[in-house]
Curated annotation (Swiss-Prot):
It is a multi-pass membrane protein. Its cofactor is heme b. Heme b 2 binds at H86, H159. It comes from Oryza sativa subsp. japonica. Monodehydro-L-ascorbate radical binds at L116, Y117, S118, L119, H120, S121, W122, L123, G124, I125. InterPro entries: CYB561/CYBRD1-like, Cyt_b561/ferric_Rdtase_TM. GO terms for cellular component: membrane. Heme b 1 binds at H52, H120. This is Probable ascorbate-specific transmembrane electron transporter 2. The keyword Cell membrane does not apply. The chain crosses the membrane at residues 12-32, 54-74, 85-105, 123-143, 154-174, 197-217.
């Protein structure tokens, strides 16, 4: 669709990067200035939880988004080099996401809170599992040992489509997480119209816009001819 409308990827990568910086700053301001800081070990267990949204947004979503857009950010770069960067960024995103999830479990366990009772937690485990499966498939099919060329050509559109599905599911999970945490805080007395509440809500809006820009950048053509073996999803 983006290609059919004559939309190029480059402007959306610029918008995505600006929104990524904004989202990263907002989540850091929230967790450090409003929530007291970050820690892996602390008497104040909330500091352990604060690591969770920071790593999930900056480490998991933003780095994963960079991996998705890398073919459009550097369209003239050697395809094998771009593919390696794509693979490494996704791997780092998965690791940081796993650490972020660990911090949520650690906070719950040390605070006497049950685990895996909410839709956010179910989707969180589901999405990072799908993300890992997607990464393994991509590694085996497109990197090492690598499938036959005709198999790669047939698998690529599905790899891209499934990757974007997992990405959108990840964004939805993040939005649910922000909503869930803000609801808990407001039920504990946080001002519904206070600065912190507005910051969290605006963070959610920025993340949504960021995700939209990334998806458009992923499906739109680059401003130069696509490298061999990679093209935007065809839309008939």
């Amino acid at each position: 669709m983006a290609a059919g409308l004559g939309v190029k990827a480059a402007p959306f990568t610029y918008v995505a990067h600006a929104l990524a910086v904004a989202a990263a700053v907002m989540v850091l301001v929230w967790c450090i200035s409003f929530r007291g800081g970050l820690a892996f070990e602390a008497d104040n267990k909330n500091l352990i939880f604060n690591v969770h949204p920071v790593l999930m947004l900056i480490g998991y979503i933003i780095l994963g988004s960079e991996a998705i857009m890398i073919y459009k950010i550097f369209p003239k770069l050697n395809h094998d080099t771009t593919k390696l960067i794509h693979l490494i960024l996704h791997a780092i995103a998965i690791v940081l996401g796993a650490v972020g999830i660990y911090c949520a479990f650690k906070f719950h366990n040390e605070s006497g809170i049950a685990n895996l009772y909410s839709l956010h937690s179910w989707l969180g485990i589901g999405t990072i599992s799908l993300y890992g499966i997607q990464w393994i498939f991509g590694f085996v099919a497109f990197f090492y040992p690598g499938a036959a060329p005709h198999v790669r050509r047939g698998a690529l559109p599905w790899h891209v489509l499934f990757g974007l599905f997992v990405y959108v599911l990840t964004l939805a999970t993040a939005e649910l997480g922000l909503l869930e945490k803000l609801t808990f805080l407001q039920s504990s007395g946080l001002d519904k119209y206070g600065a912190e509440a507005f910051l969290v809500n605006f963070t959610g809006l920025v993340v949504a816009l960021f995700g939209a820009a990334v998806v458009v950048a992923a499906v739109a053509p680059a401003h130069v001819e696509e490298p061999e073996g990679y093209a935007p999803i065809p839309v008939n």
